[in-house]
Curated annotation (Swiss-Prot):
Gene name as annotated: Atp5mc2
Source organism of the structure: Mus musculus
N6,N6,N6-trimethyllysine modified-residue sites: 114
Membrane topology according to the record: Multi-pass membrane protein
Role noted for this protein: Mitochondrial membrane ATP synthase (F(1)F(0) ATP synthase or Complex V) produces ATP from ADP in the presence of a proton gradient across the membrane which is generated by electron transport complexes of the respiratory chain. F-type ATPases consist of two structural domains, F(1) - containing the extramembraneous catalytic core and F(0) - containing the membrane proton channel, linked together by a central stalk and a peripheral stalk. During catalysis, ATP synthesis in the catalytic domain of F(1) is coupled via a rotary mechanism of the central stalk subunits to proton translocation.
Protein name in UniProt: ATP synthase F(0) complex subunit C2, mitochondrial
């Protein structure tokens, strides 16, 4: 941020009585230089400064920090839940592999049951894929609907 600051050289800053204060003002970044003329304090502003405030007003409010922390916790819980639901999609892939692996083993043991084994394999594939899509849908619901 210091590298991005712009240096100021206006007429009001150059009108200084000493050379030293002018060079100090000209070398200060724009964010540190006050370009407006200072306002004279009025009686109302002085009386508001003199009002004593209770000590409880000096304690900073924690509501902003608490809400930011609770939002972070909610976001983390959302990502953890979506990640856990995504693991179900990987389980679907493992289930499909198991179904077709069992089809190959069953066909190798008894080739005469080819049609019945294939029917059961398609049913197992459909159920496993449906569970995977359900898990993916739950993951997207957790991420974008909550």
């Amino acid at each position: 941020m210091y590298a991005c600051s712009k240096f100021v050289s206006t007429r009001s800053l150059i009108r200084s009585t000493s050379l030293r204060s002018t060079s100090q003002l000209l070398s200060r970044p724009l964010s540190a230089v006050e370009l407006k003329r200072p306002q004279m304090p009025t009686d109302e502003s002085l009386s508001s400064l003199a009002v004593r405030r209770p000590l409880t007003s000096l304690i900073p409010s924690r509501s902003f920090q608490t809400s930011a922390i609770s939002r972070d916790i909610d976001t983390a819980a959302k990502f953890i839940g979506a990640g856990a639901a995504t693991v179900g999609v990987a389980g679907s892939g493992a289930g499909i592999g198991t179904v077709f692996g069992s089809l190959i083993i069953g066909y190798a043991r008894n080739p005469s049951l080819k049609q019945q084994l294939f029917s059961y394999a398609i049913l197992g594939f459909a159920l496993s894929e449906a569970m995977g899509l359900f898990c993916l849908m739950v993951a997207f619901l957790i991420l974008f609907a909550m």
